[in-house]
Structures are given as structure tokens and as C-alpha cells.
Design a protein with these regions (language model features):
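Acidic, contiguous N-terminal accessory segments
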Residues: 6, 23-160, 353-362, 369, ...
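Active-site neighborhood of glycoside hydrolase catalytic domains
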Residues: 269, 274-372, 378-391
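Extracellular glycan-associated modules
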Residues: 509-678
Length: 678
């Protein structure tokens, strides 16, 4: 009996030890990687396996979010997500929209609660919060492609550190197609960036256009009935499609801020109506002392703001006020009057006004309304942020020295320093001024793309290449603030595994190891691939024929690659109004193997395995009389050279995202087509 009792004690002790050890070694899921980073995470054991069903609790608005989520889920993972009613079962995803005060207090306007157990539940007190919760689930899902799109069990209560998280696109100097803006809305939503500012008018720099304002590039991009002929001829948006863009953005939780920039950066308006241009400060400045200026600008804003269903649907409208001259006291006071007038004019239509910070640069006595006015603080010499806070403005942190992208300009950033921003910046840092985190005066942060050098060869694909890593980085810093816990090395490595957005691939990235092979390419043939992005190699063997000028090898919606370009009959490519050519012609009866490679800096041609030519950046100089260098003559008969020492230069880009959608109508015999991407 005693022996049996001892055996029982040993068995009991063993069982207890086993239980303790198993509990101690149980695998609790670490915080999963998403962008922006979850503010907090409570891990659990195991994985959630999706059933492909979802349940909605919360009325019509919740149903609309669920439909959007289901469509994006299908696009992203390739599997349907269908609705069901009744009690959720294991593997179901539940979307809950609660409007009670407790949820609103805990989650705020954009927060959500995500619980992943046998059932996954997204709970929010607002439509925006519910949308953001679905973005988290989508990002978690796509990282588990090889495991069947399972989700790590655990829970989070996630809400942003800053209420405004955004980006500004200069569409005035460089036309950005509506198709890209629609993709951009989806990308921003996927990374919980909630503000897209569209800069609708601007102009190039006069020195690149013969120092002639009349010849200098300028554009206003929106359809305009009030002033027929004002709208740009080289690319514009109809009012109907601009409204549809805003509706799409509303679905995705993104606010569109349209910007009409006055009274500087206004050459498009003075091209149309020269009498309102300033003869003293330049025709890119409106004449603030001319009553016709105010009639014109009033009429312009009114067209987009009046009526029950205005073209500008959102709550905020940006009136510009950027970089006007402060040369004289009287012009400073008139600028302040102009700014105050248009803040109040926009408000008269029920909108909130936004301005570029300029009131330190234009310091004066004329009062400018500050209550409920949004100010973009971009350069502290133009608007001292602490003084603007004291005056009562609501600030947007967009410091030029940190978050301005000016593609290929040679100043500001070509690509943002994402490591510095990730490690060291939050919206509380405006230039050299540091505010407390979550200071109530700071609405949030943005970055910007300014296309200063109109005509420099930069394409939308080049802009996208610069924009996307910045978007991911600013997303993290504007949502999570100073509380990021992942190292930049980990962030920078894992961000590459995430999509741009469901069904969006503007960079034309291919899956690792993917290739396109075509044994014989026939005229007019479609390939099943639209294009291939940077890091590509396109190789083929060609037995040349007599190809007329304009003969196409491949084309897509974005670009055309020529066997014989339309101007000179050389190998070349065209996109967005630019034509670039290699110094090479396809020769009749000659058989060669050609390869074209391309990255974000250059496009290269190889002939029979040897590099023939690289089309990299070209430095172009603006020659002006003031740059003429003078030399002392040794005597009256000595020859004097004409030498320029130009300070203004442009770096013309010759990159290409290679088109593959459709073969052209060529005569040459083309075989062995092979396309790959690093």
C-alpha cells in the first residue's frame, strides 16, 4: 500500500512538472509586423485559420466597409470572402461598428480593437476606425501567403498618435493621371494615411524657358466653366472625375484637400488674364492692388464651392498663400489682407481653410484670421511654428528640409532619408523646433512631392519610386509617433514584403523568380503582362527587316518601345510626352541579340552581350546673358571667346518601366524573348 502511494506521488509530481514546463514553454505570438506599427499587442497562442466568411454588426455603414474589405481580400489573397448571418463560427471575421460613448472614448475617431482568436473581430466606433482595422487584417493576411493566410492569435487596441497623416502631390508642374491618383488613394488607405492634398496649379522656373514668362510652363488642372480656356491642354481632370476621386477616397477613409495656390505660383492665371499679373514682382504673382484680381479669384473658388453638391466635397480647401514677395511694407499688408479675405471666403461656403505658412515672412499689422485655420508649416523662416501656435493656428508638420521630395533637382531630397525619419523624426519636429509629442496645436504630419523642374524627363513611375518608401515611413511615424519598437533594419526589410495595396502594383514588381518567355513574338500579340518595373532585363534575338519610322516593338498604357522611333528610325522609347533614343538602328537582314536593362537611374542597351549605350541623366544648362563670363583682352585685336558660366541646370532623366502589354506591327523576325527582374 505504501509503495502504491509513493508511485502515485511520483506520477502526480511528474504531471505537475510537465504542466509547469509546458506552460513555461508555450509559444505566445509576438507583435506582428504591419505598417503602421500596432500601438500595443497582447499575444496569444496559435493561429487563426480563415473560413472565408464574414459577419457584420452595425448597420449600413458597417456593411459598406465589409463589402470593400471583402473585395480587397479577394484581390489580395485570391480567395473569396462571403457574408453570412447569425452567430459567427470558428474562422469567421466579424466587423462591429459601435456608436456608444464608451467605445468612442476608448477608441477615438480612428481607433479600432482587433481580437484574433477562434473568431477574428474588428470593433470600431467610427467608419474610419473600421476601415483601418480591415487594413491591418489585410496586411497580416498577405504576409502569411505560404501558410494559407492564417493570422496570429492575439489582440490590439490601436489608434493613431496624430489625426492628420498625409501627402501632397504637385500636379500643376507635372500632370499626374487620374488613374494614378486613384491608385494613390488606395495605397494611402492601405497604410492608414488619411489626407491627400492635390496641388492643382503651379508653374515652372522662368530661367528654363528663355527667361520669358509667356513661354514658361504653367497649368491649372481642373475643368473650368467660369473661365473657358483656363484649363491646361497637356492634361487635366474633369469635374465629374474629380468628384468620383473624392467619393472613392471617402470609401477608403482618405480626405482629399484640393489646393488652388494664390497669389504666388499663379502663372497659369496670368497667362489666361495677363492684366492681373504683377509687373513688379513677376507674372507668377497676382497683382494684389488690382480689383480685377479679386473678381477673378472669387469666381474661380466659387465654381468649385457653391451649391448643394460642390465639386470640392471635403471639409478642407487649401488657398495656397505660398512664397509671395515681402519686398515692401505695403505689399506685405496687402498680402495679409488677401490671405484673410480668402480664408473667410472659403469659410463662407462652409469649408475649413488651409494655408501655407507665410506670416513670419509677411509679418505685419493687418489681422489674419487664425481660429479653425489649418497652416502647413514648411519653413520656419516663413512661419515660425511656435509663434503660429501662439496666434491660434492648427499646424501641419511638413518641414521642407526633411520631407520635401523634388525629383532629380539636385536640391532638397530626390529620395527621402527614410532611416533618419524613422529613427529620429515625428510630426512634433518642425524644422529646428521641437514640440511635445501630441501637442494639441499639431494636427499631424505630411510629406510632399514638388515637380519643380518641369520637363526634366521625370515620369509618374519615377515619382512613384520615390514616393512609396516615403509613404510607408511617414505612415509609421504619423500613426505610432515616437513609440516605434521595430528597428529600422527590420522595418526596411519587412516593408518590402507588403503590397502597395490590394490590386495595385504601380512599381510593376514581379514575384521573385518569375520570367516571361516567348519563343516567337508575333505582330499584335498580347503577353499577359502589362509591364516590368525597375531591375528588369528584356532580351530577344531579332533578324532585322526594313522597318518604317514609328514601328513599335511593345506598348502599354504607360509607354511605347520602338524598333524605329518616329523621328529618326532608331531604337527608342516614349512616355508622357518624352522621346528617348539609342544610337542604334535595326539593320535589314542582320541577326543580333538585343537586351535592354533598366533601373531608376538609367536605361541600357546591349548588342550581342556587349554594352552599346547607357541613357542616364543628362545635365542641361540654362544659358542666360547674366551668366556670360568676361575676360580681360591683352590688346584690342585679341580674340575673346564667348563663355557661359551657368548656375541654373536641370538633370534630364531617361528611365523606362518597360512596356509588355502588346507587340507592335513589325516586319522583323523576333525570337527567344526573355524578360526577368532582379
Amino acid at each position: 500500500m505504501k509503495k502504491n502511494l509513493n508511485d502515485f506521488k511520483r506520477l502526480l509530481l511528474t504531471a505537475c512538472c510537465t504542466l509547469v514546463l509546458s506552460c513555461g514553454w508555450a509559444t505566445v505570438n509576438e507583435k506582428p509586423f504591419v505598417i503602421p506599427e500596432l500601438k500595443q499587442w497582447s499575444g496569444a497562442e496559435g493561429m487563426f485559420t480563415p473560413s472565408g466568411k464574414y459577419v457584420v454588426k452595425g448597420g449600413k455603414n458597417a456593411q459598406e466597409v465589409a463589402k470593400l474589405f471583402a473585395a480587397d481580400y479577394h484581390d489580395l489573397v485570391g480567395k473569396p470572402l462571403t457574408p453570412k448571418t447569425g452567430k459567427p463560427s470558428a474562422g469567421d471575421i466579424v466587423l462591429v461598428l459601435q456608436s456608444d460613448k464608451k467605445s468612442a472614448r476608448l477608441l477615438g475617431k480612428e481607433g479600432y480593437r482587433l481580437t484574433i482568436g477562434d473568431v477574428t473581430t474588428i470593433t470600431a466606433s467610427s467608419v474610419e476606425g473600421l476601415v483601418w482595422g480591415t487594413r491591418t487584417v489585410l496586411q497580416l493576411s498577405e504576409q502569411q501567403r505560404s501558410a494559407g493566410f492564417v493570422l496570429p492569435k492575439g489582440s490590439t487596441q490601436d489608434k493613431p498618435a496624430y489625426g492628420l497623416r498625409g501627402f501632397m502631390m504637385d500636379c500643376g508642374r507635372k500632370f499626374i493621371p487620374m488613374s494614378y491618383l486613384r491608385s494613390l488613394v488606395k495605397m494611402m488607405s492601405y497604410y492608414k494615411m488619411n489626407t491627400l492634398q492635390i496641388h492643382l496649379n503651379d508653374n515652372g522656373f522662368r530661367q528654363f524657358f528663355g527667361n520669358d514668362w509667356a513661354k514658361t510652363q504653367a497649368a491649372f488642372r481642373l475643368e473650368c466653366d467660369t473661365y473657358p480656356g483656363l484649363t491646361a491642354k497637356d492634361g487635366s481632370y474633369s469635374k465629374a472625375e474629380f468628384i468620383e476621386l473624392q467619393k472613392l477616397a471617402e470609401q477608403y477613409g482618405v480626405n482629399i484637400i484640393p489646393e488652388i495656390d494664390v497669389p504666388a505660383h499663379s502663372l497659369a492665371f496670368t497667362h489666361y488674364k495677363p492684366e492681373i499679373g504683377s509687373r513688379e514682382y513677376g507674372m507668377d504673382h497676382l497683382d494684389l492692388f488690382n480689383p480685377e484680381t479679386y473678381k477673378f479669384v472669387d469666381g474661380l473658388f466659387k465654381e468649385y464651392l457653391e451649391g448643394k453638391n460642390p465639386v470640392f466635397r471635403g471639409k478642407i480647401v487649401h488657398i495656397g498663400t505660398d512664397e509671395y514677395s515681402n519686398a515692401k511694407k505695403e505689399v506685405v499688408e496687402k498680402f495679409r489682407y488677401f490671405t484673410d479675405h480668402y480664408i473667410k471666403y472659403v469659410e463662407s461656403f462652409g469649408k475649413q481653410a488651409a494655408v501655407w505658412g507665410a506670416l513670419t515672412h509677411a509679418k505685419g499689422d493687418t489681422k489674419v484670421k487664425s481660429e479653425n485655420v489649418m497652416m502647413h508649416c514648411w519653413y520656419n523662416g516663413y512661419a515660425d511654428p511656435k509663434e503660429m501656435k501662439r496666434q491660434g493656428y492648427k499646424l501641419v508638420s511638413i518641414p521642407d528640409g526633411l520631407v520635401y521630395i523634388v525629383p532629380a533637382a539636385g536640391y532638397y531630397y530626390d529620395y527621402l532619408n527614410c532611416q533618419y525619419l524613422y529613427d529620429s523624426w515625428t510630426p512634433a519636429q518642425i524644422g529646428n523646433e521641437k514640440f511635445e509629442e501630441n501637442d494639441s496645436a499639431i494636427l499631424g504630419g505630411m510629406f510632399a512631392v514638388w515637380n519643380d523642374h518641369a520637363g526634366n524627363g521625370i515620369t509618374v513611375k519615377d515619382i512613384h519610386d520615390r514616393l512609396f518608401p516615403a509613404l510607408q515611413t511617414l505612415s509609421a511615424k504619423c500613426w505610432t509617433g515616437a513609440a516605434t519598437s521595430f528597428s529600422f533594419e527590420k522595418f526596411n526589410r519587412l516593408r518590402l514584403a507588403l503590397s502597395e495595396a490590394p490590386a495595385v502594383n504601380e512599381a510593376a514588381r514581379w514575384q521573385k523568380g518569375k520570367q516571361l518567355r516567348i519563343e516567337t513574338l508575333n505582330p499584335g500579340q498580347t503577353t499577359g503582362e502589362k509591364e516590368v518595373g525597375y531591375g528588369y532585363r528584356v532580351e530577344f534575338t531579332i533578324e532585322g527587316a526594313d522597318e518604317p519610322k514609328g514601328t513599335v516593338l511593345f506598348s502599354s498604357d504607360n509607354a511605347t518601345f520602338y524598333l524605329a522611333d518616329p523621328e529618326s528610325g532608331q531604337l527608342g522609347f516614349a512616355h508622357e510626352g518624352y522621346l528617348n533614343k539609342f544610337n542604334y538602328r535595326v539593320e535589314k537582314g542582320k541577326k543580333v541579340t538585343l537586351a535592354i536593362t533598366g533601373d531608376n537611374r538609367k536605361t541600357s542597351l546591349y548588342v550581342d552581350g556587349k554594352l552599346r549605350e547607357e541613357l542616364g541623366p543628362l545635365t542641361l544648362y540654362a544659358m542666360q546673358q547674366k551668366d556670360l563670363a568676361t575676360f580681360q583682352k591683352s590688346d584690342a585685336t585679341a580674340w575673346q571667346p564667348v563663355v557661359y558660366n551657368p548656375s541654373a541646370k536641370m538633370h534630364y532623366q531617361r528611365t523606362l518601366v518597360f512596356p509588355l502589354q502588346k507587340a507592335g506591327d513589325f516586319k522583323s523576325h523576333i525570337t527567344g524573348v526573355k524578360v526577368s527582374q532582379k
